A protein has these predicted regions:
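Intrinsically disordered, low-complexity Ser/Thr/Pro/Gly-rich regulatory segments
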Residues: 1-278
Length: 278
């Protein structure tokens, strides 16, 4: 029953599960229960290691030590839970992993999240390519590593990264250099702050997404002859190069911090909207 709250001895739960689930040990069950449990502590604001003090702040989203991620309560030798909250936890954690926002220090989990995030990014890029093709006004060239046999790199030979989507509006004589990112929606001020830093703020040698994007746009402008040669566009003097940043969800920090950077969400993508970009 989803509405029931269950209270059972820890040892009884382990015994029941080992008897009813094949190829599972008491050690594995214990590790799982410990990973999704909350225990009593002398000071509510003090969490056991390796958790951070921020993991107890109720206004923070995606806390490693929250009831959303730890729906079981341990009390002495008993555990208390509800099936509905357990199911919610599975959906919630799966969503965090898929969105690449699951906080973990486990190397294997971090590697898995990175792999899933990369795949999600590729799928999003493919979807944007489909939308641009469906508009019917563009010549679309995804995932460009080289232009006219020249690598996209700076004067020192250091790579500037691939161009996610290069597309051409022949009737308007425009070449668009598009960066695509499947960022999750920022749900609170802290996530907005992280989004702002990742998107717009350079930190030493680590450059933000906008800076990297601008460098690729500049490369295309400096190699316009190569672009026109490879894409058979004719006279370079007729063409202008436009940068475009396409995201899955609106970048709220762009408005909050009054940055006015030209960013288009997937839902906005249309011929009219694209042609408004300068």
């Amino acid at each position: 029953d989803d509405n029931e709250i269950y209270v059972k001895k820890y040892s009884d739960v382990i015994e029941i599960l080992t008897q009813n689930i094949e190829k599972i040990t008491a050690e594995i069950i214990t590790r799982v229960i410990e990973d999704i449990s909350i225990k009593a502590r002398e000071d509510f604001m003090k969490l056991p290691k390796p958790y951070r003090k921020e993991d107890v702040y109720p206004w923070r989203f995606n806390r490693a030590y929250s009831f959303n991620r730890r729906p079981i309560i341990q009390r002495d030798d008993e555990i208390i839970w509800g099936n509905r909250q357990l199911y919610h936890m599975m959906e919630y954690v799966t969503g965090l992993i898929y969105n690449g926002t699951y906080s973990t220090k486990d190397k294997k989990m971090s590697k898995l999240i990175g792999k899933i995030s990369n795949q999600r990014g590729k799928l999003f890029n493919n979807r944007i390519v489909e939308i641009l093709n469906d508009i019917g006004e563009f010549q679309v060239y995804p995932n460009r590593k080289k232009i006219n046999k020249k690598s996209i790199c700076n004067e020192n030979g250091e790579t500037l990264g691939d161009i996610d989507v290069l597309f051409v509006d022949v009737s308007e004589k425009r070449i668009y250099v598009a960066e695509t990112k499947a960022f999750p929606f920022s749900r609170n001020p802290y996530e907005m702050y992280l989004e702002y830093n990742e998107m717009f703020v350079d930190k030493g040698k680590k450059k933000c997404y906008i800076t990297k994007h601008k460098r690729r746009i500049e490369w295309v402008k400096n190699h316009l002859h190569d672009v026109c040669t490879e894409l058979k566009l004719g006279n370079t003097d007729l063409w202008s190069v436009i940068g475009l940043f396409i995201v899955e969800e609106p970048i709220i920090s762009n408005q909050v911090y009054n940055l006015n950077v030209e960013i288009i969400s997937k839902a906005e993508l249309s011929l009219e909207r694209i042609r408004k970009v300068n």
